[in-house]
């Protein structure tokens, strides 16, 4: 077992951890995507592309959460490509995308639409986004709804203003990410955020192996010359000070002129001031036209906990949208 990640896996009994990659997973990650890069704000963006059955097939855009990357979907996208073309995006400052001089939710949304445009789909795509990516997808749909067909947010909770909490309000300054001497040391410290146990330990290890990068002494990738060589995390720590999620998300969610859906982990976490069920009830009130449903057995990181159920739910929602004419607009 490579990961020693803050005790999150220790919450599970040894017999609950699945250590060996099952056949479906091995076959999925053997389906390698095409890596594509897009110039953006004196930097570049990266996304992964998996071809579907034809260029004329409908299209899916997948977006990761905070501090994550497109590789979170390496084993999800191939489950969708028998039916759809799929891209998985790296947000600016995360994964293989470059770092920017500054970040905001609007800049994130601009980056998303630039990659979607670069994919040059034959028809408007459905946007499926997880956690922090769910917020970014809402802002993207708010500004660029005419370039999207539908939107699904996955375990991102739109809260009423009186219980909304700005995620990064207590981060006044950033610190360079820690540098570990070896790749193995870095991977052993990988942990999910928010932290949770995950029975699919083979997936946690796979994600961890794609979450680190090598740095050399004097390299400027850490927002300043690194004083040591080794391995560190791929995300830019300067994203968070001053980053605003916004109190206007309920109005944005309510008014997006697209079919929407919400997928949630049935075992995901509650919040300090309100339960997850109460938040989902609030979201249903905002969008009574939209399905909001749980994936049984999944915590916050749905695609890690229940990957095939996650993919099946996406496929079912895509078929519902097709039948209701969402892709004909």
Predicted segments, located by residue:
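Alpha/beta-hydrolase fold catalytic core
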Residues: 1-60, 82-84, 121-122, 281, ...
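Active-site loop/oxyanion-hole signature of alpha/beta-hydrolase fold enzymes
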Residues: 28, 40-43, 48-50, 88-128, ...
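Conserved HGGG/HGGXW glycine-rich cap/lid loop of the alpha/beta-hydrolase fold
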Residues: 46-96
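Gly/Ala-rich beta-loop-alpha elbow adjacent to hydrolase catalytic centers
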Residues: 129, 133, 137
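Flexible "cap/lid" loop of the alpha/beta hydrolase fold
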Residues: 138-142, 149-183
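Conserved alpha/beta-hydrolase catalytic His-Asp/Glu region
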Residues: 181-246
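Conserved loop-alpha-helix segment in the C-terminal half of the alpha/beta-hydrolase fold
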Residues: 255-298
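Catalytic histidine-centered segment of alpha/beta-hydrolase-like enzymes
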Residues: 295-307, 311
């Amino acid at each position: 077992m490579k990961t020693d990640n803050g005790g999150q896996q220790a919450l599970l009994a040894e017999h609950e951890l699945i250590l060996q990659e099952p056949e479906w997973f091995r076959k999925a990650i053997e389906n390698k995507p095409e890596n594509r890069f897009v110039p953006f704000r004196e930097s570049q963006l990266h996304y992964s592309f998996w071809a579907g059955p034809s260029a004329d097939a409908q299209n899916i855009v997948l977006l990761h959460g905070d501090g994550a990357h497109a590789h979170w979907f390496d084993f999800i996208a191939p489950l969708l490509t028998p039916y759809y073309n799929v891209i998985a995006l790296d947000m600016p400052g995360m994964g293989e995308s470059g770092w920017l001089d500054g970040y905001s939710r609007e800049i994130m949304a601009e980056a998303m639409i630039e990659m979607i445009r670069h994919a040059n789909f034959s028809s408007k795509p459905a946007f499926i986004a997880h956690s922090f990516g769910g917020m970014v997808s809402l802002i993207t749909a708010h500004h660029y709804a005419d370039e999207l067909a539908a939107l699904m947010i996955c375990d991102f909770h739109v809260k009423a203003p009186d219980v909304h909490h700005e995620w990064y309000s207590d981060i006044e300054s950033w610190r360079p990410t820690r540098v570990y001497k070896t790749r193995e040391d870095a991977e052993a410290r990988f942990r999910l955020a928010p932290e949770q146990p995950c029975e699919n330990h083979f997936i946690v290890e796979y994600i961890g192996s794609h979450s680190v990068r090598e740095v050399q002494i004097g390299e400027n990738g850490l927002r300043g010359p690194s004083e040591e060589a080794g391995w560190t995390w791929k995300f830019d720590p300067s994203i968070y000070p001053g980053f605003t999620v916004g109190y206007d998300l309920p109005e944005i969610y309510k008014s997006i002129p697209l079919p929407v859906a919400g997928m949630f982990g049935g075992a995901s976490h509650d919040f300090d001031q309100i339960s997850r069920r109460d938040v989902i009830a609030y979201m249903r009130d905002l969008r009574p036209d939209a399905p909001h449903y749980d994936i049984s057995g999944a915590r916050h990181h749905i695609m890690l906990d229940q990957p095939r159920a996650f993919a099946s739910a996406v496929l079912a929602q895509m078929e519902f949208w097709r039948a209701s004419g969402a892709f004909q607009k």
